[in-house]
């Protein structure tokens, strides 16, 4: 049948179903196909913490939201244009995110009485009960159609049913005029060792596409044209993958081999897994028995001359705190990547937050200041990791890089850079010295000490957690301790001399300055433009460098009457700013729900104080 093709600037699709319905893969494949087609994209995987949550329950719903556009896309979108609900629980959990004009695709085979009741409905009519009967509802027997498509495939019934996500993906590909070839290529690569599965998956994908083209419920299809991008080679990249590659780039630029000692933890494990793939680039990885062993092996590797890395999330950062103090007092280069998740304790492992900031800044015994930087988007994780490595090695100090589950698991198009565009990394390595070696003698500008590797004659020195003097001799002298504490703090403070100036986006004479840090950038930036479109005078100051702050921070704040600090915690950055720059007043907008901001929340918060 004929369908009207409508051009649109952008569209948001939300796939949701049981944890075993393959929604993460479905969303990823749609995002990858759109990225390869040339669209701007932003993704938001949202899944339960349980390995297999209870079947058919709201708590067990797994979702994946994709925002594609022909222009700039900075968030996964607040509300969706298309909602795919593979069962009643998925519809119940996600109907609130469907726009009034949304299309809702329902697998009618799963909407039986038992599953409707299990999802907590009061009636047997979920659509009416949820008040979405005025949406464009596409009732499709997806499970039955999948079985029919693959009845001659030779696969067992359980394996066939698992393919219903591919049928659904085919329907969505038709609705948005996505080419099938990219996904065909993925299937050929994924099932290279199981070739019998390639053609059945291709067939069910095509049959879903063909089915959608022949039903009256889909009256229109949509085209999102490729975005206008700078010339170059692009790929879709997740935050965790970008972090790993940025660390490898820092290793290459410094000439120091990369060593990563880590313990698997959600949502940071993918960084260790990605690094382990690249042994051909001189990367060494160790999956340690626990968090403490992971960081301690990394410190040992740093002492031996490696660019040392350890990765973790909030609970692991707590366990690593004593060893972080060891890295700080020995003044060895180390990058600790904390992919933040909901806490405290185990918390909600698969949900995102920014609640580790205070721990990163202060969570150690003694006077133990550590440099803290943050990534603001999945692709920016590359630059953030690269510069964290540069600062760690050039200034001989541990650096904490804060990312978030939202960034680590999320993805967006990334223009693959040329390493010629990145600065050299020049660690203060010493091969020989005249006279007695002073391991804690400092560069007069940066206050960094020299990096002396074991085995160099005349450069032997002690390291360890006990206080030392400049000569590296253990000392409990009060005056020496005060001197060393002050020098280590001064070294971190002087890092500000090497940071770029903080930038402000928006009106210089704005009524409100929105302040954020880390992974909230896309939502704050989009909110800024929506407010400007309303005629409001607003500006955005988003921080990638936390400790130390950029040197011009106070000059920026002095220009604005109202400063609104927005963050996914109870106000940790606002409290830090009050301590560092108490001459200014700070308003707050906070969210601690294990979910990222939605743009409307920020717009409403700013309008409330204008």
Provide a role label for each language-model segment.
Residues 10-98, 245, 250, 258, ...:
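Thiamine diphosphate
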Residues 47-48, 187, 204, 225-229, ...:
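A glycine-rich phosphate-binding loop feature that marks nucleotide/adenosyl-phosphate handling sites
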Residues 50, 148-150, 217-232, 250-257, ...:
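Gly-rich Lys/Arg/Thr-decorated short loops/hinges at beta-loop-alpha junctions or inter-strand turns
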Residues 132-135, 139-143, 351-404, 424-435, ...:
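Conserved thiamine diphosphate
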Residues 237-246, 254, 389-610:
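Flexible, low-complexity linker and terminal segments
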